[in-house]
Amino acid sequence: MNKVFFFFVLSLVAVMVNAQQNRIDVIGSSAPELAAFGRFNIGVTTIDVVSSNTVDVINTPRGGETAYYDRALTLEIWYPANLRGEEPGTVYEVITRNPDIRATLTGRAVRDAEPLLSGPYPLIIVSHGYPGNRFLLSHTGENLASKGYVVAAIDHKESTYDDQQAVTSTLYNRPLDQRFVLNSLAQISSQSEGPLGSMIDADNTGIIGYSMGGYGLVNNMGGGFSEQ
């Protein structure tokens, strides 16, 4: 009985520690076999891409002249990394649904680690819901990078917790954002730009769409809009 009780106490302490740290790299005992992390160390970096001369849905009046703007998108990118003595682990400071409350997520990626250049690696684009942010599937991003993928999660402008605008912008821009990010990363890959340039195999790309992200994906796969 004492052994059983002692094991229960240790298990409870472990759960409490993980909860306090908001760890995103914990694999539950009941998780399927493929949920385990892969063999690669993980790096993470943040980049911005800008879609120039994009229709500004929010500021275009009904029946009026179309407004345009430069649409900036922030990407969180996880990738296989070549660690040189760094200890795995990073902290993500995340805005929540209440913009006044920040959450701290703890993972195993290393910020701006040296890329492992034995690729190229297939690309996965992650598209969040409305509203949301690029960190909502950070656990998936880290996990896939450990298995040999480059994972790019988008902060969709006017669709994040701290930048939420009318849903009309999201309906119009979501599939366009996904396509623009793919094309931008393909260009980075083709020109071997920056440390990630030679890592990305943009010809082998998948998209993970959560909620409104799935809507954008369906449209990009050929699902059209109705006239209404």
Residue spans for each PLM region:
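Alpha/beta-hydrolase active-site loop
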Residues: 136, 167-203, 218-219
